[in-house]
């Protein structure tokens, strides 16, 4: 997915676009119901008539535009939306090639049960780690890691709520206990994982919330109810010149 993002950015730059990295958009200024400018966190005001935001409608309208500048109908629609799933991710580095681990496919689903209802219930608890997806980047791109090594990520879907209830004093232990359980599940399919594991870094829904800036660390946008699909959710804001893109206004996060 990062390679896809890089390709899109490269094309944007090639056609004359200006991309600013490490430069947060802090505010969207609205005048007379229309987009007027974007203010960066450094205080620079950039005049514009259009903004396409992939930050999600909640941060965009509440944090950047400001509720006081939003039409009442827009806020009413926003209030009806439900924050969707986040994830627990274990990033791993190994001291061998994928073939030595028995990995010959880039993506593998590893599950302890075939019951989707059971799996969904577990996503709302801290004893999940029963359903996972492991992606080894080096299978599709042998040059992704240095020779003789490989990288993989192990992911299971989780809601943020149970993690928000963990006291700070217990967060570290809870996070690594969950990572251990997830790794044990993956070992059922690839028994030599732990033997060749050199580096491992877990990320909880709170980690994703911090770095994505999305409510609940959501990776797929809103909950997948029918009312949250593009059939009912408009990508165009009631504020003239403001548009939404990304998983919050599309399908399942499978789009740039």
Language-model segments: residues:
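Helical element adjacent to the flavin cofactor pocket in flavoenzyme catalytic cores
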Residues: 1-42
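Generic, well-ordered alpha-helical scaffold segments in large soluble proteins
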Residues: 7, 11, 15, 54, ...
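Beta-strand segments within the central parallel beta-sheet cores of soluble alpha/beta enzyme folds
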Residues: 9-10, 22-27, 48-51, 196-203
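C-terminal segments that line or cap access tunnels to active or ligand-binding sites in enzymes
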Residues: 95-206
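A glycine-rich dinucleotide-binding beta-alpha-beta segment and adjacent secondary-structure elements
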Residues: 129-135, 191-251
